[in-house]
């Protein structure tokens, strides 16, 4: 698959285009140009490392939204076996922006739930651009309760710009569905491991992201609103999105500093889409480590630690200034 380059990656794109030209010319050339191709490849890798070593929060948000970035189904297909998708909320409809079902992880039966975006126009519409409606969150809730009933670990993958804000969704209780999920996940009697793989947009992300281990991919984002949305409110212009991204603290490193996530999963240079096998291996290792650690605790201890985590959010200290 041909890589789609972002605006700030254009110097890399130009080098890669030259490499492709040389590869094409090599087939009809009597001169060996493999050394030149190798030199340009090394230069491209060095440039990629340099650019990705100093990304701004706004640029990271663009990487998090990259159209070729691995989605939940990609992780399910690569990390789990015997996946059996479960459909519907048993109340209204089946929401294709949320997928979930039973699977095996290293031979152990687990429940997997995640947001799912689309690749082409048809699939994007089918998946509602990864924006769940109330029935999607209620489907997720049904699967969470099944996981609890059968005492199996729960894995969630977060990648959404936010919950769908349409009139129908609001009429069917979007905020209630999100709030109910938060309430149930806070006391779910199984290990819960949440991984932000792309965009973690507001309550739409949080509705499947309350757990015992919260981890993020290196170039994922997690925030109460998109940078564009924040800029539109504060400055009445989405053009200020880069400034908003800087202020909001949407990156994995910033959130780790604040104690809102537990672990950052390193991505290949250039992002998860540049080397999906390496990304899958890194995520699998992180999931294995988290599951092994959580299974050492009793359910009572898990719930106690989860409660302490939730009650610890938003704490601050007052300091007298003399």
From Swiss-Prot:
Gene Ontology cellular component terms for the protein in this record: acetyl-CoA carboxylase complex
KW ATP-binding (keyword) present: yes
Biological processes per GO annotation: fatty acid biosynthetic process; malonyl-CoA biosynthetic process
Record pathway: Lipid metabolism; malonyl-CoA biosynthesis; malonyl-CoA from acetyl-CoA: step 1/1
Domain CoA carboxyltransferase C-terminal: 30-293
Catalytic activity reported: N(6)-carboxybiotinyl-L-lysyl-[protein] + acetyl-CoA = N(6)-biotinyl-L-lysyl-[protein] + malonyl-CoA
EC number: 2.1.3.15
The UniProt record lists the keyword Cytoplasm: yes
Keywords per UniProt: ATP-binding, Cytoplasm, Fatty acid biosynthesis, Fatty acid metabolism, Lipid biosynthesis, Lipid metabolism, Nucleotide-binding, Transferase
Top-level taxon: Bacteria
Gene Ontology MF annotations: acetyl-CoA carboxylase activity; ATP binding; carboxyl- or carbamoyltransferase activity
Protein localization: Cytoplasm
Enzyme class: transferase
Family, per entry: Belongs to the AccA family.
PANTHER family linked to this entry: ACETYL-COENZYME A CARBOXYLASE CARBOXYL TRANSFERASE SUBUNIT ALPHA (PTHR42853), ACETYL-COENZYME A CARBOXYLASE CARBOXYL TRANSFERASE SUBUNIT ALPHA, CHLOROPLASTIC (PTHR42853:SF3)
HAMAP family per the UniProt record, alphabetical: AcetylCoA_CT_alpha
Function: Component of the acetyl coenzyme A carboxylase (ACC) complex. First, biotin carboxylase catalyzes the carboxylation of biotin on its carrier protein (BCCP) and then the CO(2) group is transferred by the carboxyltransferase to acetyl-CoA to form malonyl-CoA.
Subunit and interaction comment: Acetyl-CoA carboxylase is a heterohexamer composed of biotin carboxyl carrier protein (AccB), biotin carboxylase (AccC) and two subunits each of ACCase subunit alpha (AccA) and ACCase subunit beta (AccD).
Protein's recorded name: Acetyl-coenzyme A carboxylase carboxyl transferase subunit alpha
Species per Swiss-Prot/TrEMBL record: Nitrosospira multiformis (strain ATCC 25196 / NCIMB 11849 / C 71)
């Amino acid at each position: 698959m041909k890589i789609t380059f972002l605006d700030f990656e254009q110097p890399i794109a130009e080098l890669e285009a030259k490499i492709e030209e040389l590869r094409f010319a090599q087939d009809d050339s009597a001169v060996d140009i493999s050394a030149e191709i190798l030199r340009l490849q090394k230069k491209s890798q060095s440039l990629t490392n340099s650019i990705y070593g100093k990304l701004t929060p706004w640029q990271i948000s663009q990487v998090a939204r990259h159209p070729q970035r691995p989605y939940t189904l990609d992780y399910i297909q690569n990390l789990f076996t015997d996946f059996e998708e479960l459909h519907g909320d048993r109340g209204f409809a089946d929401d294709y922006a949320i997928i979930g079902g039973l699977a095996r992880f290293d031979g152990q039966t687990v429940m997997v739930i995640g947001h799912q975006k689309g690749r082409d126009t048809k699939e994007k519409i089918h998946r509602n651009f990864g924006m769940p409606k109330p029935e999607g969150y209620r489907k997720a809730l049904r699967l969470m309760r099944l996981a609890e009933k059968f005492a199996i670990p729960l894995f969630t993958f977060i990648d959404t710009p936010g919950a769908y804000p349409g009139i129908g969704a609001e009429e069917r209780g979007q905020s209630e569905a999100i709030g109910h999920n938060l309430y149930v996940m806070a006391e779910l009697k199984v290990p819960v491991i949440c991984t932000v793989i792309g965009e973690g947009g507001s309550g739409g992300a949080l509705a499947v992201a309350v757990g015992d281990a919260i981890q993020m991919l290196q170039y994922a984002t997690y925030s109460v609103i998109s940078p564009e949305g924040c800029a539109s409110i504060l400055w009445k212009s989405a053009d200020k999105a880069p400034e908003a991204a800087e202020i909001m603290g949407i990156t994995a490193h910033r959130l780790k500093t604040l104690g809102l996530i537990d672990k950052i999963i390193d991505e290949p240079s250039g992002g998860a889409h540049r080397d999906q096998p390496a990304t899958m291996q890194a995520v699998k290792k992180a999931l294995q480590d988290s599951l092994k650690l959580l299974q050492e605790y009793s359910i009572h201890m898990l719930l106690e630690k989860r409660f302490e985590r939730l009650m610890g959010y938003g704490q601050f200290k007052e300091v007298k200034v003399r």
